[in-house]
Amino acid sequence: MNKLTIIVTYYNAEEYITGCLESIKQQRTQDFNLIIVNDGSTDQSKKLMDEAIKDYDKNIRFIDLDENSGHAHARNIALEEVETPYFMFLDADDELASYAITFYLEKFNNTDGLIAPIHSFTTQRPQFVDLDRVRVEYFNAKENINSFLRKQSACNIIFRTAIVRAHHIRFNENLNTYVDWSFVLEYMKYVNKFVRIFNFPFYFRGEVYDPFETLTLSEQNFDILFKDYVNSFYDAIKRATNPKVREFIVTKMGNKIANEFEPTRYDINERYQTHKDTLVELSKFLHVHLVKNQKLINKIETILLMNNETDKAFKVNQFRKTLRHVKNIVLRRKNKERSLYDLTDKEDNVKPKTIVFESFGGKNYSDSPKYIYEYMQKYYPNYRYIWSFKNPDKNVVPGSAEKVKRNSAEYYQAYSEASHWVSNARTPLYLNKKENQTYIQTWHGTPLKRLANDMKVVRMPGTTTPKYKRNFNRETSRWDYLISPNRYSTEIFRSAFWMDEERILEIGYPRNDVLVNRANDQEYLDEIRTHLNLPSDKKVIMYAPTWRDDEFVSKGKYLFELKIDLDNLYKELGDDYVILLRMHYLISNALDLSGYENFAIDVSNYNDVSELFLISDCLITDYSSVMFDYGILKRPQFFFAYDIDKYDKGLRGFYMNYMEDLPGPIYTEPYGLAKELKNLDKVQQQYQEKIDAFYDRFCSVDNGKASQYIGDLIHKDIKEQ
């Protein structure tokens, strides 16, 4: 007979149920029973569950509930079916490490409970237990009983069935989300000895794919969560008889209030107003604990709440933030300029004739913001123009524009005063876009790879899928206008960026005006070639690959390994061609072109990619949006997609049919590519029909007047203010 039962309850968990069950199937010991409860799912969860266990050689107890009643009820139903001496819960959106059950059974030693850590989602998971890292300790219940409560979860705890049955312990079905303490607190009363595991992962939380729809606890709506947390707190206090346990629960509640009503939260005003009555009630209940452990300014806020003076309490809450900023300024800390901005930014600061521009986070003077600025500088010279740069001294801006250094006092002043912001990438969320400011987002390419809300998973440093999507959503909510180059992009932007179509301007990219207006301006083209010191008798190949989400070295910096085989290209093409290498702006590593000085040129830091398009006889790319801009010229394109399987399926995925819709041949190895590059005219003729179709679908909106459209729009807006 097995000693342990694993209980899995699920409701509409189609994104996770397969991974959860696979983690059970992959346990290195199968000496356990399994109970699976379908809590009235209405999606494809049951079908996927059936598929996942169809070849699983285990006698599973299935329970199907007619309607969703919450996981407290589902777990209580499952408890009636447990036939083993011990049991544990595994949430359907979580997974067990393959070594977990083996290790648990080895260490349990017939105690009354085993507590193992719960880790956040990660793709980097160990395959074996590191015995030098893991720590196992046995406790008497009187010593460290609060261990059961630390994660506020009943998952990854092994319970003794006899204790639960003898004392009829059940989950409180009147609670919605924070139901676990109701069960664990009752169970703790009867524990004598237990074992706790430290310092090594055994249980992983599932990844959140859609933070706006997910049922995952940490990502649910705050208003609903906080209300249920408070209800669970009062329920827990009633159940807790041990003074140490009560103190632990009270401390948890105090920390919860401090964290959720932290003055710097962007939605603190809304939170405070919505939950002010609850805060009053909690302050009265917790006043001894809170006042004892708080700083003076926090105590004043608590006392005001106790006296039901919520408006004054909120002012004190915000004064706490003010004090921090003042401290940063007085002590001249590195973020003192930002603190000054937060303290002084207000709508009255806005000056109608001031426009601030930024391109690629201040990297250079380039892209659509450049062309909008140059149009406005020519036709509306009396406005005040400001450009934001990481390194202002390294960027030359024609005309009268002021240059400011990112995160300097002048930078914050510019964003506080400008009536219009123009950027081609996201701006920091700590910049406060006020009601009387207009934010024009030009964006920086027709999308091929999935973006933001359309990405199932995000594999970027310094963030998680839900955090990335929530922050992106906050950013796009500030955009008053988003420029789209075509109908294809408009449809994608609506979904990926949570945009309503009224805010989308389908006018083509301002940066592409030059491709329409100057493609046949030979004098202009010769100037560009001369500036780059290109030989006049050689054709120009441009190689512009994208960055890979998973090849990062740090936040915002990515590596790129040149797979195109320059040596072979040089041998095949060196007599008649030069190649321009244009890395994505997020690529941080410099290219080593030693030995190819007369053949390969790194133009990654050349500010204007449109000028490079104009002098290139053909383009090599992979999954970069440059293909859409270059398509305006109707010249040959080659697609070097050496990692197509990984990129299409494992990373972001594509919006279009990559294998069918491209205006040129696809190569997965460099040698065939090198040979085909010798025959540009042949490729042009062979793919002319696809080149024309590609142009009609993605490039035909670009008419050379997008910069004028935006410049005139800003001018009109200023005149009407």
From Swiss-Prot:
Keywords carried by this UniProt record = Cell membrane, Cell wall biogenesis/degradation, Membrane, Teichoic acid biosynthesis, Transferase
Q: Which GO terms describe its biological process?
A: cell wall organization; teichoic acid biosynthetic process
Function description: Responsible for the polymerization of the main chain of the major teichoic acid by sequential transfer of glycerol phosphate units from CDP-glycerol to the disaccharide linkage unit. Synthesizes polymers of approximately 35 glycerol phosphate units in length.
Which Gene3D superfamilies does this entry report, sorted A to Z? Answer: 3.40.50.11820, 3.40.50.12580, Spore Coat Polysaccharide Biosynthesis Protein SpsA, Chain A
Give the catalysed reaction(s), semicolon-separated.
4-O-[(2R)-glycerylphospho]-N-acetyl-beta-D-mannosaminyl-(1->4)-N-acetyl-alpha-D-glucosaminyl di-trans,octa-cis-undecaprenyl diphosphate + n CDP-glycerol = 4-O-{[(2R)-1-glycerylphospho](n)-(2R)-1-glycerylphospho}-N-acetyl-beta-D-mannosaminyl-(1->4)-N-acetyl-alpha-D-glucosaminyl undecaprenyl diphosphate + n CMP + n H(+)
The reply to whether Magnesium figures as a keyword in the UniProt entry is no
From which organism does this entry originate? Answer: Staphylococcus epidermidis (strain ATCC 35984 / DSM 28319 / BCRC 17069 / CCUG 31568 / BM 3577 / RP62A)
Q: Where in the cell is it found?
A: Cell membrane
Q: Does the keyword Hydrolase apply?
A: no
Q: What is its EC number?
A: 2.7.8.12
- Family the entry assigns: Belongs to the CDP-glycerol glycerophosphotransferase family.
PANTHER family reported in the protein's UniProt record: TEICHOIC ACID GLYCEROL-PHOSPHATE PRIMASE, TEICHOIC ACID GLYCEROL-PHOSPHATE TRANSFERASE
- The protein's name is Teichoic acid poly(glycerol phosphate) polymerase
Q: Which InterPro entries match?
A: Glycerophosphate_synth, Glyco_trans_2-like, Nucleotide-diphossugar_trans, TagF_C, TagF_N, Teichoic_Acid_Biosynth
Its membrane topology is listed as: Peripheral membrane protein
Residues annotated for CDP-glycerol binding in this entry: 443-447, 511, 545-546, 582-584, 624-625, 629
Pathway connected to this protein: Cell wall biogenesis; poly(glycerol phosphate) teichoic acid biosynthesis
One Pfam family matching this protein: Glyphos_transf
The molecular function terms in GO held by this entry are: CDP-glycerol glycerophosphotransferase activity
